[in-house]
Amino acid sequence: MITPEIKQALTQYTQNMNAPLSFVLQVGEHEKRDELKTFLSDIASVNDKLSLVERDVAELRSPISFALYLNDEPTGIIFSGIPSGHEFNSLVLAMLHATGTDMKLDSGIQQIIKAVDSPLQFEVYVSLSCHNCPDVVQALNQFALLNSNITSEMIDGGLYPELIEQNNIQGVPTVLLNGQVFANDKVDTATLVSKLQEFEPDLASKAQPAEQLPLQDVTVLGGGPAGVAAAIYAARKGLAVTLIAEKFGGQVKETMGIENLISVSSTTGPKLTGAMMEHLNDYDVTLKEHLRVTQIEQGDIKKLTLSSGEIIETKTLIVATGANWRELNVPGEKENIGNGVAYCPHCDGPFYKGKDVAVIGGGNSGVEAALDLSGIVKSVTVYEFLPELKADRVLVDQMAKRDNITVVKNAATKQVLATNGKVSAIEYEERETGEIKQQALDGIFVQIGLVPNSQVLKGVVELTPYGEVVINEKGETSAP
């Protein structure tokens, strides 16, 4: 499982470990335990400071659970399952962060986490094919390392079906806090911090203030391609630049296949995001990641209040916050997010293997989702509001070749129906006749486009009713 090439890379990564680290594996019998034991032994072999210990530990839930111990003391980080696939990076980063490698968490966020003074037990349910899950696991692992009141456990849902059933989990990542659902589906570090501040409202006031940045020439909101480009261009002029991003990479990071970036015939969102980060690091740009701007105070010097409580003063503000998934806004949608309603086919598709699902939306995103899901699920029904699909012809032609994809056009989704806490059917209207119909199914993937991330600009600049920024013929907003 651990190839010679990976061992060589791990040897280099771990050469600066500053303390002994143990993988403490729970004793007992399990069909996957030998595989996990070999996996951990191979990793431990790359450095004398790493070791594998088998021990009966009350906090470990099964014989395929292990914890990281630093100097024979628990770090608060637990893995239940074999962290291979996308989660291998989560394990490696946990090892490195525990033994001295600097964390990438913003200093303001670190101060908030250090201020937690009550026990917080996080459980993160993942699938090893989920490309969003590692970000959540890695963030919570860092929380645990920063504060001994916090524990973080990654749980591979594929190896714990009884827990998936018990907790009614139908999408990943799903995060439980002290046994209750804390966050699911569209989760990132900024969301975790925001929800944690809701859970403990006085965290920001208890936290030690982060070091104040000097006056910035340019501050950019948004970490997608547009925001990164703006920051780089400004930095090349010798200006003092800060980039604020809830999630570096933006929507691009969640895109698995990119084939329309001229000069790059094919790439993936994570690869492109990594290249953007490398490019940004070539310049003197301050990156404030996993933070939200909660308030903008106008004036010659603009003041931005961040979710950490930090205030950034800037001469110029560039907003490149992009867009987010558009919601249906029908009864049953929000109530069933994570219980049958999803927005990411790559993340949640595996949970519907052999089941019937719907995709709402007949544009490129919807048809691509249907194509991806058709290789996993029993059947896919695509519902399109308009009389014709708006997806590119090449995608429509591919879809026509799949026997398990059905298309319903001119259909308006009316509500999502659930039984026993799980999605059981969709209700829609045939727009031509007005007839209301229902179709039994197990999951619904919403792919109906995007809405602007412009909430923070309300009252700052003029917006359209849809949240778009109004500009004049010179590209100027209503605010100087």
Where are these regions (language model features)?
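Non-catalytic, surface beta->alpha helical segment in thiol-disulfide oxidoreductase systems
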Residues: 69-102, 176-205
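Beta1-alpha1 glycine-rich phosphate/pyrophosphate-binding loop at the start
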Residues: 127-128, 132-134, 140, 145, ...
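A short, basic/flexible loop-to-alpha-helix module at the beginning of a structural domain
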Residues: 198-216, 342-352
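Residue-level detector of alpha-helix initiation sites
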Residues: 224-226, 323-325, 363-365
